[in-house]
Amino acid sequence: MGVGGIDQAAAMQKAITEISQLVPVPLAIDTSDTKALEAGLKAYPGRALINSVSAEPERLAEFLPLAKKYGAAILCLPLSDKGVPKTASRRIEVMKTIIAHAKKAGLKDHDFLLDALVMTVAADEDACKETLHTLQLYRKHFGYPSTMGLSNISYGLPNRPLINSTFFAMSLASGLDAPIMNPYDQ
């Protein structure tokens, strides 16, 4: 939820209430608005996933207590106030920070889903290699399930479905557990 000019919290509460009655699967709540997040978590009758918690101090301070209060899982995004880490090793360091803060806030091992943070190869030719290495290091250092927005790899490029399916196979081999992807790509 990120529409300007409306009451974000009220809109989130209404959306979560309506959607949760229509689908039998857990919902991921994606907003940067703390009040909207709490409204969504409060309205949701199940265990939600907060998408996402980064290492930015404000995000840690505001979102982690809400995750604990409402029993939500968190999608951990290796992003800090310094921006997007270019290397897998730096992403591990950022992820360690997020997990340490989350555990200090009372979250448990079963509360974490780690995002590998896919960047497009159109802007950085090392993006694919670093993402795959990140997945491998997540498995080695943490053992928590991993996810990522698969199609980000091909943003701005032609023949995206082919690039995405190739990257998908490589990602699975590197330890990806739960891709965020277009199920209609062939």
List where the protein language model places each region:
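Glycine-rich beta-to-alpha transition loops that act as phosphate-gripper elements at the mouths
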Residues: 28-36, 53-57, 148-155, 161-162
